[in-house]
From Swiss-Prot:
Subunit structure: Core subunit of respiratory chain NADH dehydrogenase (Complex I) which is composed of 45 different subunits.
The reaction(s) this protein catalyses: a ubiquinone + NADH + 5 H(+)(in) = a ubiquinol + NAD(+) + 4 H(+)(out)
Family matches, as InterPro entries: NADH_UbQ_OxRdtase_chain4L/K, NUOK/Mnh_C1-like
Protein name: NADH-ubiquinone oxidoreductase chain 4L
GO biological process, one term: ATP synthesis coupled electron transport
Keywords from the UniProt entry: Electron transport, Membrane, Mitochondrion, Mitochondrion inner membrane, NAD, Respiratory chain, Translocase, Transmembrane, Transmembrane helix, Transport, Ubiquinone
Known function: Core subunit of the mitochondrial membrane respiratory chain NADH dehydrogenase (Complex I) which catalyzes electron transfer from NADH through the respiratory chain, using ubiquinone as an electron acceptor. Part of the enzyme membrane arm which is embedded in the lipid bilayer and involved in proton translocation.
Naturally occurring in which organism (per UniProt): Loxodonta africana
EC class name: translocase
Gene name of this polypeptide: MT-ND4L
Taxon lineage: Eukaryota, Metazoa, Chordata, Craniata, Vertebrata
An annotated Gene Ontology molecular function: NADH dehydrogenase (ubiquinone) activity
Entry's family note: Belongs to the complex I subunit 4L family.
Membrane-spanning ranges: 1-21, 29-49, 61-81
EC code(s) of this entry: 7.1.1.2
């Protein structure tokens, strides 16, 4: 396995560990999720460049669209929670249930 793939996989694992460890604040969870999506996008882009299958070039773009939607929804949720409760704790997400 080339070193670039190992580095990208390591970046994904570090972001995953960060998501699992720093779950108290929503902003840190969102940053770790963005790191995971960025490493997945980079890995998919590199793999699609190495493959000779032409339809595989659209997969990184679709993943990038999903990452942008996830970031927009996460930031909207963060703004709503911080305006309502004044804090960005993940525990406040339970208070939003009907």
């Amino acid at each position: 396995m080339p070193y670039i793939y190992m580095n990208i996989t390591l970046a994904f694992v570090i972001s995953l560990i960060g998501t699992l460890m720093y779950r108290s604040h929503l902003m840190s969870s969102l940053l770790c999720l963005e790191g995971m999506m960025l490493s997945l996008f980079t890995l998919n882009a590199l793999l699609s460049l190495n493959m000779n299958f032409t339809l595989s070039t659209t997969v990184p773009l679709i993943l990038l669209v999903f990452a942008a939607c996830e970031a927009a929804v996460g930031l909207a949720l963060l703004v709503m929670i911080s305006n309502t409760y004044g804090l960005d704790y993940v525990q406040n997400l339970n208070l939003l249930q009907c």
